[in-house]
């Protein structure tokens, strides 16, 4: 994400009337990094007031914002997350207002302090093990491959998959080819844990050298642990193959399952 401006200053958007009173006096910036389909704003600069984030979704994206609110409520018992300040749902829109976790994303920290890469990866691995150790029986959300494949197929059939955003290994592939090659990697035995669903460097927040929380939890649910490992491994590839290798070592996997890894990377292309 280093090639784009991460946010852009903007004017206050038109808001649901129930939010108006709380948000006067803030400066506004629109996020350019998130790929959820929702519009995300950072609210800052109001004297004696906390920094906030506001996420807005319309249509089907409103359902995604609602999913995130529900998962934030549940996961906060186990992991450090933003706090919900306000949630509004109408037939067409959803608004989710949360506190901001102070600090910088793991991506930003790796860019600014490349010599700290090993320490950063170690912290990521420990945090991920903590998430994956939450008892599956406590999780009410399903995100297994059957569920995700159904979502992926629906997105493909409705023309919602952006082939121009595929990883370099699949650059120029039609969506149908990714679908076909992905299915060649099935079946495999699932190793189900509670997953984040989009465990990328931009969704993990560091402050003063410590990993203090995660954001964008709308895909949290029970799935194979490689759902998270694959996405994080892929992100680390932007920095160094040695960091990719270290991730598995510190997580506790001596021999990574490359079949599962590739399956989940292909699956992620549909979202």
From Swiss-Prot:
Alphabetical list of InterPro entries matching this protein: AGP_Transferase, Aminoglycoside_PTrfase, Kan/Strep_kinase, Kinase-like_dom_sf
Pfam families named in the record: APH (PF01636)
SUPFAM superfamilies: Protein kinase-like (PK-like)
Top EC group: transferase
Molecular-function GO term, any one: kanamycin kinase activity
Keyword Protein transport applies: no
Keyword ATP-binding belongs to the record: yes
Miscellaneous information on this protein: This enzyme is encoded by the kanamycin resistance transposon Tn903.
Purpose of the protein: Resistance to kanamycin and structurally-related aminoglycosides, including amikacin.
Protein known as: Aminoglycoside 3'-phosphotransferase
Species of provenance: Escherichia coli
Gene name per UniProt: aphA1
């Amino acid at each position: 994400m280093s090639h784009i401006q991460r946010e852009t200053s903007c004017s206050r958007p038109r808001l649901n009337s129930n939010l108006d009173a709380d948000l006067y006096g803030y400066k506004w910036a629109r996020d350019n990094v998130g790929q959820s389909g929702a519009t995300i704003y950072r609210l800052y600069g109001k004297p004696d007031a906390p920094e906030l984030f506001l996420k807005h979704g319309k249509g089907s994206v409103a359902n995604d914002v609602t999913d995130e609110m529900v998962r934030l409520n549940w996961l906060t018992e186990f992991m450090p997350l933003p706090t919900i300040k306000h949630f509004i749902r109408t037939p067409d829109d959803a608004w989710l207002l949360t506190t901001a976790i102070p600090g910088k994303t793991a991506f930003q920290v790796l860019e600014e302090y490349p010599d700290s890469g090993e320490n950063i990866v170690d912290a990521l691995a420990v945090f991920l093990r903590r998430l994956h150790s939450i008892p599956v029986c406590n999780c009410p959300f399903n995100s297994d491959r059957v569920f995700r494949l159904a979502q992926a197929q629906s997105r493909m059939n409705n023309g919602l998959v952006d082939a121009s955003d595929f990883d370099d290994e699949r650059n120029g592939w039609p969506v149908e080819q990714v679908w076909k090659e992905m299915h060649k990697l099935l079946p495999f035995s699932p190793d189900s844990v509670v997953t984040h669903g989009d465990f990328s460097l931009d969704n993990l927040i560091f402050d003063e050298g410590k990993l203090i929380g995660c954001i964008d939890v709308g895909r949290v649910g029970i799935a194979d642990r490689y759902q998270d490992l694959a996405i994080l491994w892929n992100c680390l590839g932007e920095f160094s193959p040695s960091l990719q290798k270290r991730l598995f070592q510190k997580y506790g996997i001596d021999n990574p399952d490359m079949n599962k890894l590739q399956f989940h990377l292909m699956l992620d292309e549909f979202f």
